[in-house]
Amino acid sequence: MSGAFYETYIVSELVKNFYAHGKTPKDFLFYYRDTDQKEIDLLYVDGSTICPIEIKQGIAPKKATKNFSVLDKYHLNIATGLVIDSCDKIRPLNEQTYYIPVYLI
């Protein structure tokens, strides 16, 4: 499965999950890309807290969170980041980010 199809599948599953819980996804999920073309696949916004999410097809991609730091300039409350990938269990990437297996979404 190509990366674009994989991302579409994950986002579709997340959207279905929101609707299943009576929430409108467009109120919570956003895409980020700045003028330097740095992007983050999803931003989950809940009140004043933002959780950056990257979707990667491989297992434990090391550079998955390289663009999370672009959010620092906005001085917002940034929650623990997530990398949804093909790993087998939840595990930390670092102090601020966790790998989440795709089968848990």
Predicted regions and their residues:
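A cross-kingdom feature that marks ATP-driven nucleic-acid transaction machinery
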Residues: 1-105
